[in-house]
Amino acid sequence: MYYWTDLHLEHDDKDDRIVEAVAAAFEIATESVTVGRIDDAVQDAWNAPGLQVLVQRDDPVPGRLEFPVTLMVTLRHGTGVGDPVSKVRAIARNLGIGLITDVETQGDTWRLVMPDGKDKLVQLDPSSDQGTLLLTRQDRQELDRHRVAVA
């Protein structure tokens, strides 16, 4: 099941775990989501200009309560910056990632080197002003721990 939204996620009570997982993912990705009601945290994150979210809910895991969730965050920005490194930095700034010590190229994927060691990966589309923030393995582990905690 897919959810696509600009500002909010349409959900009912049985999808609360998805909302919690998305909020946790945003907290991991942006490091700027304040603790509060889950819906408020998600709404705050989605109110960022140009932020769009695709959430895929996979089939339930046999014997477990939670759903595996795949999250893709895509940000469109209108900076008009042509330099790829500047473009990645602009995407990162718009995502609330302010402290970047370096940008490393890995093909179409750019690693944003963070001073705290929690590097971020951005998938860059060189033909447009678009970038996708990818969850790293560490991000996914933190998200998994959160999902187990709320289950």
Model regions and ranges:
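Short, extreme N-terminal segment that most often corresponds to the first beta-strand
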Residues: 1-30
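Ordered hydrophobic segments in well-structured contexts
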Residues: 4-10, 52-54, 68-72, 98-100, ...
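Structural alpha-beta junctions
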Residues: 26-32, 92-101
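A general secondary-structure signal for short beta-strands and their flanking turns/coil
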Residues: 2-4, 64-68, 92
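Short, hydrophobic/π-rich interface segment
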Residues: 78-99
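Short, flexible beta-strand-to-coil junctions
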Residues: 12, 74-76, 104-106
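Acidic, proline/glycine-rich low-complexity IDRs
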Residues: 89, 97-151
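Short, intrinsically disordered low-complexity segments
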Residues: 31-81
